Swiss-Prot record:
It holds the Pfam family GidB. The keyword Transmembrane does not apply. It is an enzyme of class 2 (transferase). The lineage of its organism: Bacteria, Pseudomonadati, Pseudomonadota, Gammaproteobacteria, Chromatiales. Specifically methylates the N7 position of guanine in position 527 of 16S rRNA. It catalyses: guanosine(527) in 16S rRNA + S-adenosyl-L-methionine = N(7)-methylguanosine(527) in 16S rRNA + S-adenosyl-L-homocysteine. Transmembrane segments: none annotated. This is Ribosomal RNA small subunit methyltransferase G. Its EC number is 2.1.1.170. GO terms for molecular function: rRNA (guanine-N7-)-methyltransferase activity. Its main location: cytoplasm. Belongs to the methyltransferase superfamily. RNA methyltransferase RsmG family. GO terms for cellular component: cytosol.
Amino acid sequence: MAGDPLLPALHTGVERLGLTLPEGAAEALITYLRLLERWNRAYNLSAIRDPGEMLHRHLLDSLSILPYVEGDSLLDVGSGAGLPGIPLALARPGLTVTLLDSNGKKQRFTRQVALELGLHRLRFAQARLADYRPGQPFDTVVSRAFAALSGYVPEALRLCRAGGRVLAMKGRLPEEELAALPRSLRGCTLTALDVPGVAGQRHLLTWTAPAVSATEEANP
C-alpha cells in the first residue's frame, strides 16, 4: 500500500534481513497486514493487535526464513492467518504455497487475502495435519509455532519430497522437544535468526527428507 506509514519500516527490515523483494511486494505485504489488522478486530486471528508489532513479529519474522525455502512448492502447516505462507508467497511469486489449517474462519480470511492480492498460486487445505493426504509431496514443509516437534516432524517428512526440507520456526531452542523425538530425527540443522524489531530468541530447525518420502511411495 503506497504511502502507508509502515512502508519505510518494512523496507528497512527487509534490507536488514539481506533480502530483495520483487516489485510491488512491499506494498502487497502492507496491504496484507492491514487486512489482518482489520479482520483481527472481529475474528481474533492474532494475539498481536498493534500494526507496528505485527510488521516485525509477523511479516519480518516470516520473511526471515525465505533463504531456507527449497524448490517451487511449500506447505504451511497450521497456517492460521497465513503466516509464514502468505509473506513467502508475496516475496517469491513463483512459489506455490498451500495453507493447511483445520480452522475454517482463518481459511476464510486467507482466501479473502488471496482474492484481494491476486495470489493465484496460493492453495488451501482445511484438515488436520495427520489426516492430510495431498496428491504430490512438497519441496518445503514449514510450521511456525504450530505444535510440539514430536507431533510435527514425522508427519511433515511424510509430506515432503525426497531431498526436500522440513522447517520448524521456534522461539527459544526447544531442547526438550528435540530430546522427545525418535533418535533418528534428532539430527537437524539449527539456525539462530536475527529478526529486526524482535527482541526474543528465534530459531529455525531444518530436516532433510530421506531418499524416498512416504507420499512418493504411495504415488509412484
